[in-house]
Amino acid sequence: MRSAVATRRRFLAIGGVALAGAVLSRSIGAEIIKDVSAGFGAATPTLPSPGGAGINSAGVTTTTPTSTPTPTMPAPTPATVTIPVPVFQQSMVLDCETAALQQGLAYYGINVSQSQLFAGESADLRPPVMGPNHTVLRWGNPYTNFVGYVNGSDWTPTGFGVYWPVILRLARTYGLPNAIGGEGFAPSRIYSELAAGHPVQVWIETRFARVPLGAWTAWDGTQIRYSYAEHSVTLSGVSPTQVRVNDVLNASQYWVDKAFFETNFADFNNMAVIFQ
């Protein structure tokens, strides 16, 4: 297994400038990413005591009023939910999507190696057609195949990744027939699924970096939105303000603010696979 230094997207550079956030550590942005040891709790409201009730001689139900009016209770704050999804590290340079899938399957007791899962992604090894300013004009279709070399470089680029239809197909093939996937998921839907105990694989940028986005035309004509920091992780928990991330880049687990997550999530058109 490769070290964290050798794994995917540890350091990205455009024009010689390091992309801050692409290697975001737990000591940076403490208000954004919380360690998994941080706890969350919801206060339990105290309800007023009910008044006594009786029946008078006329057969009419009477109620003894309480000493204070009963207030209208606010909607309860959602509790923090964590899902015991195993944390794995990607075993190849660019197989983050495969490793995130492996985590989702393992939660349901389905143990499949990354190499076996990756074999089902039918990598398209044709090189890209590059344009000006280090942009990609033409390349493969990650909606149908893994694009490029899995142990290549996503900056050169000689390798890229794979998108939700391939991951969904593999999830169903290996024992989760009710898994669903797609794009355009509202963040509220993702949070509801997590609250229900369903791990969710999402597409973001590495360490939630903010980097330029582009689009290439696949060999079959499909328009592909891409980023040189494309990454995939498994969400394994939700609180009123944050989501918990199982990050296969270096087998870490941490919390990130919902607002920060939602910005990154939108970069790949709210792409997700829900494991259920």
What is each stretch, according to the model?
Residues 186-190:
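Surface-exposed ligand/attachment interfaces on beta-rich extracellular proteins
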Residues 162-163, 167-180:
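Mid-length scaffold segments of soluble, non-membrane domains
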Residues 196-200:
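Loop/turn elements at helix/coil->beta-strand transitions in domains of secreted/extracellular proteins
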Residues 6-10, 15-164, 206, 213-219, ...:
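Active-site-adjacent structural segments surrounding the nucleophilic cysteine of cysteine proteases
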Residues 171-172, 195, 214-227, 233-276:
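Noncatalytic regulatory segments and standalone regulatory/sensor domains
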Residues 100, 182-184, 204-208, 237-239, ...:
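A mature extracytoplasmic/lumenal domain signature
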Residues 1-2:
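N-terminal Lys/Arg-rich, disordered targeting/topogenic segments
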Residues 101, 105-110, 122-123, 172-176, ...:
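Sec-exported extracytoplasmic/periplasmic mature domains
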